[in-house]
Amino acid sequence: MTLKAVVGNDKGARFRVVIVGGSIAGLVLAHCLHHAGIDYLVLEARDRVDPQVGASIGIFSNGARILDQLGVYKSIEQLTESPVWYNMLTGEGALVQKVDSLRLIEARTGYPVTFLDRQQVLKILYDQLPTKSKVLTSKRVLSVDHLANDIRVRCEDGTEFTGDIVAGADGVHSRIRREMWRHAERNNALRYLKKDQEAMSAEYRCLFGISTAVPGLAGKSHYRTFNKDWSFLIAIGKDNRCYWFVFEKLDATRRPPTMPRYSESDQKEFVRPFLKRYVSQTVTFDAVWENKISSALTVLEEAQYNHWTYDRIVCLGDAIHKMTPNIGQGGNWAIESAAALTNKLHVMTKTTNQPTIEHIRATLREYEQSRQPRTKEVCETAGFATRLEAFSSFWHRVMSLYVVPYAGDMLVDVHCQAVAQAPKLDFLPLPDKSLRDGTIFRIAQLGGQEDKPIWRVLRALPFILLCIAAYNTMGSTTLVPHVHQMSSTERICLVEFLGDLTPLYIIAMVESVRRGNNFTIAVLWSLFGLVGQSKGIVYAVPLYFFLHYVQCSMVRCSSPDNRHVPIHYASTLVAAVGAGYLLPTAIVLFGSTNLDVSYLWKLFPILMTILHRVFASFAPNTSAVDRIENPRADMRYLRLAYGIGGILAGITRVYFWITPVHHMANLLSDMLQLWHEPLALRNVDLRQLIRHNHLLVLGSGLFWELLHFRDLKNARRLKASWIKVLGVLATTVVIFGPGSAMALGWAWREEVLASKIQLN
């Protein structure tokens, strides 16, 4: 039977995609192709496209944005409820962690993490297809053949269909993938064919299902139970509908053709040891099982394939990238692949309505190459999560119980970094929901270039060279002498230098508690301060600048909540700097000559940090709310801190100007001396040593700020020209000194990061 006899429409001259599989991947691809103006036909083996097999699907922001572009997301959203709470428990039911990370993900991406019946999503996708006649059920494909100008699909019922390409969206046991291998093997064409044929394996199995509301399991919550060799995942959806997964490690790694298949009686045997195990602090799994609507037991196949296409055959979804379901990205990655494939086909068909076979092959290879690196990463992440939750090794257990619970929003950061670069449909407008202010997708729309770590290292290399040069010329120096033994000129130089350091220490304190800088060198700034006090600030500060710049890229503070400085820290910052740095410094500089406290002053970096923590402990910690609802709440305190730092530095400059010492007149000569005679620094007096330290430390600080301004411009967050940036900073240096310039520059950067993103 020909296509014309079945659907009343032959291929003609139009480019057509034959989609095998009415899966999530297949139906989303059909929607994408429709919007791209590309003809398609969907062949589904079952007698309906939306069977209830007990499966659920998690819709994450990377998939939701594409569904929103296609106009189907609102219907899906009506069947879901935005979750808030993530609960992590041990196998004994002890609560390890309860956080609102799911709410934070929605704030960052514009879309909630939602679960619903897979059947519901399939029904929506099918019902909202403009041409349902192009979806044919009971069409189990047997073979695919390449013709001179077309590709032909033969079905079990004897029907045949032709198109320009065949897209395999027929799941993990894909017939189309096997047909692709058959053609490639016949022509000895694919380099890693043998490896692909042996790629699939399974180390775990999963009983998954859907239950009605279970008493004791709160709405808007996800529950994960971790234990040796098994784990639970339960997501509570709309009307407290319960979507659940029971994971268990197999006794051995299985590969085809020895992959086990399970019956309903196997489910009853499997579930028996799990019934009295905890899924929450008070609920055991038997309560979930008693309310079961549907369920299924299956092995969890894992496979990463090297070849996604051959000739005019291409695969997507589980047919070509099969991952474990622990991170919920299987369906979303299928949606991504459907969009990515359509983007390539759209570009090709806009060039010509009748592309050559070689053009088609090249386009499919581009799709393959564009998806492989990102897919490899997510498959590995999913596998790692499965093993982490089942304590596959001692280190998995340690990480689960003693690292992850104390990592703050690190997992949210990892998730958002992964989805931020997700593909979209390039030929359709972006949904308003994804472009809300502060979302990762809005930030990505700025089109800033990705900054690779090696380039950050190279740009920051002058800091290391400065440290080496300073050590070779100045040795180990400290500027904490007995102040009462200084001359008046030396004391004045030291006052100005220490005054200019005030903004630097304020900035370092801010960076040490900024949310986005968790687990970076920025949190250890006080150690650099101690090294500077004992071995020389001219080494410690540039080294801090180097490590901070390399680690703390724009990615770490691009989201509003990661730029945020918790209010209890921001509001006590000035007090901590005043009590921990300014007061001890004033005592050292202007105290009684009979009181030598300079040895205590060496410890001020630690003192300032301790005082900051103590003061902050008395202020309310509103971070949980502010990071989502009001991430700019810290700005008034930061403006105050930067302003006070800049004013104090400016006051010391004014104090210096009204003294007989003409520091600015000697600045150029100092710079020339450092350039032409660096070795002469070994023989300078204390006044010159202070001035040289002043010049090197604050000069490196301004260079550090310029590097961060460069990041702002690269990310297209800063509209001001380099002439304006350099002019403002240079003018401030001349009038108020480098310390005030540092305060102004960092305050400017803070304002840019906190401002609403303008896409025009």
UniProtKB/Swiss-Prot annotation:
Its main location: membrane. One of its GO terms (biological process) is terpenoid biosynthetic process. Glycans are attached at residues 518, 621. It comes from the Eukaryota. It is found in: Membrane. Pathway: Secondary metabolite biosynthesis; terpenoid biosynthesis. The chain crosses the membrane at residues 18-38, 460-480, 492-512, 527-547, 570-590, 599-619, 641-661, 725-745. SUPFAM superfamilies: FAD/NAD(P)-binding domain. Its EC number is 1.-.-.-. FAD binds at residues 44, 58, 118, 318, 331. Keywords: FAD, Flavoprotein, Glycoprotein, Membrane, Monooxygenase, Oxidoreductase, Transmembrane, Transmembrane helix. GO terms for cellular component: membrane. It is a multi-pass membrane protein. It is an enzyme of class 1 (oxidoreductase). Its cofactor is FAD. GO terms for molecular function: FAD binding; monooxygenase activity. The keyword Cytoplasm does not apply. Belongs to the paxM FAD-dependent monooxygenase family. FAD-dependent monooxygenase; part of the gene cluster that mediates the biosynthesis of the meroterpenoids nectripenoids A and B, as well as cochliquninone D and isocochliquninone E. The pathway probably begins with the HR-PKS ntnH that catalyzes two chain-extension steps to form a reduced triketide, which then primes the SAT domain in the NR-PKS ntnG to initiate three more cycles of extension to give a linear hexaketide corresponding to the polyketide part of nectripenoids. PANTHER family: FAD-BINDING DOMAIN-CONTAINING PROTEIN-RELATED, FAD-DEPENDENT MONOOXYGENASE ASQG-RELATED. This is FAD-dependent monooxygenase ntnK. It comes from Nectria sp.
